[in-house]
Regions:
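Long, low-complexity serine/threonine/glycine- and acidic-rich segments characteristic of extracellular
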Residues: 2, 6-10, 26-85
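Metal-dependent polysaccharide deacetylase catalytic core of the NodB/CE4 family, i.e.
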Residues: 132-227, 248-252, 324-337
């Protein structure tokens, strides 16, 4: 018998979980083993009390392996787990807006004199100027709401300099080929995902320049088989975010209902043990695929301003126990546009609440793709 019980494989730790110095994060690793066995942790003897053991372990790298070993007359058993040191962690938030294609359609057809003459981008810039917020806009290649089926190759490169001049707070990224069908990559081939990604990103880079383009932090509907993750990793993706994992939000008779019965299928096919960890702590590292996971907990085109503020403050209060110092605001572009059938007149009020409340609580705006959820302590 041997089991590390204090930490789980893939857990992300910071100064709240131990004693941090410039060189290491000192943590206490605890577990259980047969009383007669001799236990070591990373080669050093552990303190014993009946079945329990404990040992102080320094985490010195971004990714660390902790190995417990129990040896007795029947042989030796070992357990190794991977732990991440979120060095120099700080409170931070990101804003991700999915399903972007309407504003790009307008740029191509309305041809505003300046990029931020467009109301949508003007609204984002106003929030950046007010709160310092940073936005990643996940884009479709095709606009399925347009009768002529607009595609990105119709957008001129006229605004490239403006995009690049504002790349410190505004990024464009791949989301999917188009909005429909739903769950486009749930059972896709490698070739399909690679084709859609490369075609979309090539156009975005042409439109906005490399400086203003970034690898995405998820794909449309947050559904992708793990055997396809490498397609994204090979293109620089480091993080997968989703509001699912352990929470199914559905519409029934015009109302939102939360189903907590099991792991959510909108969560990249991760199993329940990961889903339960994400529900409690919101972040995780998958050592099998070298990917970080983040669970978002509200959507500003579903939740009202009051609900958004309440959820953010609740999650911030919970961080005292979980140690999680990052959060993500998530929404969708189309609800900002009056011609969309589900237009929300208070769209920018909801989005402003998503930026204002974290700022009031001391969270700094970041891009999750930079470092560990926006923490560049180990480099980008």
């Amino acid at each position: 018998m041997l089991e590390i019980t204090s930490h789980r494989n893939g857990e992300i730790l910071n100064y709240k979980h131990g004693r941090e110095t410039a060189d290491a994060l000192m943590i206490e690793v605890r577990g259980i083993a047969d009383p007669q066995s001799r236990v070591t942790v990373n080669g050093l003897p552990a303190l014993r009390c009946d079945r329990e053991f404990r040992a102080e372990v320094p985490l010195k790298s971004r990714i660390n392996t902790v190995t417990a070993s129990a040896k007795d007359k029947f042989g030796e058993r070992t357990q190794s787990i991977v732990l991440v040191w979120d060095k120099g962690s700080f409170k931070r938030y990101a804003v991700r807006i999915d399903d972007n294609c309407f504003f790009l359609t307008d740029l191509a057809r309305q041809k505003p004199a300046r990029l931020f003459d467009h109301f949508y981008l003007k609204g984002l810039k106003s929030l950046h100027e007010k709160y310092g917020s940073k936005f990643i806009l996940k884009c479709f290649f095709r606009n399925d709401h347009d009768e002529a089926k607009f595609t990105l190759d119709q957008v001129p490169s006229t605004y490239r300099n403006e995009f690049e001049d504002n790349a410190d707070w505004l990024h464009l990224a791949f989301h999917a080929l188009a909005e429909f069908p739903d769950r486009p990559y749930q059972h896709c081939t490698e070739e399909r995902l690679a084709h859609d990604y490369d075609m979309t990103m090539n156009e975005l880079i042409r439109i906005a320049g490399k400086k203003a383009c970034t690898p995405p932090t998820n794909v449309h509907w947050a559904m992708l088989p793990p055997e396809r993750f490498h397609v994204l990793r090979e293109r620089g993706v480091k993080i997968l975010t989703s509001s699912g994992f352990m929470s199914n939000r559905i519409y029934v008779d015009g109302k939102v209902e939360d189903l907590k019965g099991g792991s959510c299928d909108i969560g990249f096919f991760y199993e329940q043990d990961v889903a339960h960890h994400m529900l409690a702590k919101r972040c995780f590292y998958d050592p099998d695929h070298d990917l970080f996971l983040s669970r978002s907990f509200f959507c500003f085109n579903i939740d009202t301003p009051a609900e958004i503020e309440s959820k953010i403050r609740q999650e911030d209060a919970a961080a005292a126990a979980t140690g999680c110092e990052m959060m993500e605001a998530v929404g969708h572009e189309q609800y900002a546009f009056p011609h969309y059938e589900n237009y929300l007149p208070d769209y920018f009020e909801r989005l402003e609440t998503s930026c204002r409340v974290p700022a009031e609580l001391g969270y700094k705006p970041v891009f999750f793709q930079d470092g560990i959820f926006g923490n560049p302590a180990w480099g980008k």
